[in-house]
């Protein structure tokens, strides 16, 4: 078994299916390219190794574990493995009563995995390790890191009443912001960083990327979770995210199949309807899913949507349709990964079928995982009874459980299911990751219109500035960074805050403030899912903003719904920040005052005001206050060093091998191998560098540059490319071929 970065990557003599053959061909092409690069004397860019790995194919020992585990399961245990249940992400002591239901699911129901919600990275690790210790079969851990990356779940915690942020994972702008950037490099790093931080926190599988084409401006549930309204853009950026997540060591899930973008009902509260036939699906909704499957996406999540033009007026939702899951997805698109239902707690399913029957029908249709049934025992009992009644067979259940066990084995969970807290400290919310997130937010800011030429604003302009802010009362983080930054730039700015509780007196006071202003900044934090109507903006607010826009220099900033301006037709200067979190607030503020260039483009239309691709450019006109951003995402990720050329080994610190999970004794054996080679005259000298997880753990020199030269080798000795290519090309090629079972 070959090992890359301390992790096994394959088995000998593995069977060669069509997908595996394609992987091998790509590997051969990679090897050929590497040989060409080394021969030409140009080293390939150095990649930052992921702290966790996945094997490509199963070694014999892992395959044996899968089959023996399957054979040992009773019918009830087999069905239990199909269930993955939502759990709170916050810290709870294993001795607390709050831990008891979680423990019962794992110990008594023997569920296959858990999906933690909002918490902190250390709380994740503590809770997941405690549950893994109680599980007879290792748990597969999934999480919704779909919209904002790790920060969607392992950040966003604040201490009340002070609202002090508790820190956590890297928070990216929403997925649609990456559509506004349009650069695959950013989508790739979005996936890679999300995966690295997920794995460090104990999460194995991302419920991401969202592959829905958001071509309906009235969609209340997908919106900024999507890359955009262009299926080719969604496909391209989704594929880049998948590639990045693979490098980061996590599994990916494309969702929501066969598409949830062209809907106007939230499936959490009702059943959306997509009026598309097969030809329309092929030309729009299915394009990103087909590309993702070609890219090797590991899992697909279903959509709770009705498709009357495909399944008939009385047809079941896609989640419960064998025609969609087994016919369209498995047969037509040749998907052979794990198939998840969307959460079965959602009313689009439960209102009509109930938990038990919905679980049975989902498995009948072809689903491998029953996600978040809420009543775990009811779901398991219903599927067990359906099997005893002949609606399902044990073989059918084993096929699904085998897929899940293979995932766990590829992750090495049958050998070690636990995560070290040290992994959290090493990578979660690291400076490089935060810089990348800030850079993405900056690049995504989109200036949709600016008829009056108000953007960028001058901070020192001698006029009274009024900041009119609207957000839900429960959104305590709304405008925290924006308001603080605005006061830092315009100390005399006056803020007027409104929310859904504001009465006529509050609006009258706000109108007085606007009337006295020399210019008005309007920031609105309203997600599309708040409710129905014109972006859920109350009529008094719409009237106030439209009046301000006709009487005063007014700039509108949207921190959630990009479609907001449809309800405010009199606004001519409109900035879209895409997200409400602080990373987007800082970026919008910098754009507003010209501290950074504005280059974003709409990945969606805003009918009838703007089309896909619209967006005005603005140059940077003043020095940035926040300098954490970088111009190149590869620099932010540490993949490319722009600091200048350095002699290798110079200013390099050597870490303790134990800090990256390596053995000092093992390194000593490597030294002895080199010393033996020199004794046998296999070489006159050698330089050795060993690293793992971005840390150098050994840097040594042996012997002399030429026999009898008297010139010792040093760690900074410069070698000709012929000497380097022999080692790098041959060793890398051998490791790849061993990993693919060809050598």
Predicted regions and their residues:
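Bacterial N-terminal signal peptides that target proteins for export
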Residues: 16-29
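Short acidic, glycine-rich surface-loop motifs adjacent to enzyme active sites
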Residues: 86, 102-121, 207, 217, ...
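Short, conserved catalytic-motif segment at the N-terminal edge
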Residues: 655-721, 742-743
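Bacterial N-terminal signal peptides
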Residues: 28-39
